[in-house]
Amino acid sequence: MAKEATRVRRRERKNISSGVVHINSTFNNTMITITDAQGNAIAWSSAGAQGFKGARKSTPFAAQVAAEDCARKAQEHGMRSLEVEVCGPGAGRESALRALQSVGFVITSIRDVTPIPHNGCRPRKRRRV
């Protein structure tokens, strides 16, 4: 039995003027997702998706490259202004934010939504170098 050819779905151009950027910056990687106001993903990128491997994924430069790529994808959909939600303790937080500003987005607000435990789970052991 012949398998049906999978149809390639073309991305339709959505005219969305404002959105929300979720910057998730961990110690190992930086993930950036741009959504509309309802939370539907418009564009995403990460340092690993841009070809950085291993320890280079966690650098500020990798976060900057990922943010610029994600911003270009969102600008194709007509996005101009952004709210920023930053989550996590990683090195790419500020550099991703600066990259979004340099591309030409108007940033209306910046929120830090890093979850802070009120004495929850026991943390990882401290590194001794």
Swiss-Prot record:
One of its GO terms (biological process) is translation. The keyword Ribosomal protein applies. Keywords: Ribonucleoprotein, Ribosomal protein, RNA-binding, rRNA-binding. The keyword rRNA-binding applies. InterPro entries: Ribosomal_uS11, Ribosomal_uS11_bac-type, Ribosomal_uS11_CS, Ribosomal_uS11_sf. Gene3D superfamilies: Ribosomal protein S11 (3.30.420.80). One of its GO terms (molecular function) is structural constituent of ribosome. Pfam families: Ribosomal_S11. Part of the 30S ribosomal subunit. Interacts with proteins S7 and S18. Binds to IF-3. This is Small ribosomal subunit protein uS11.
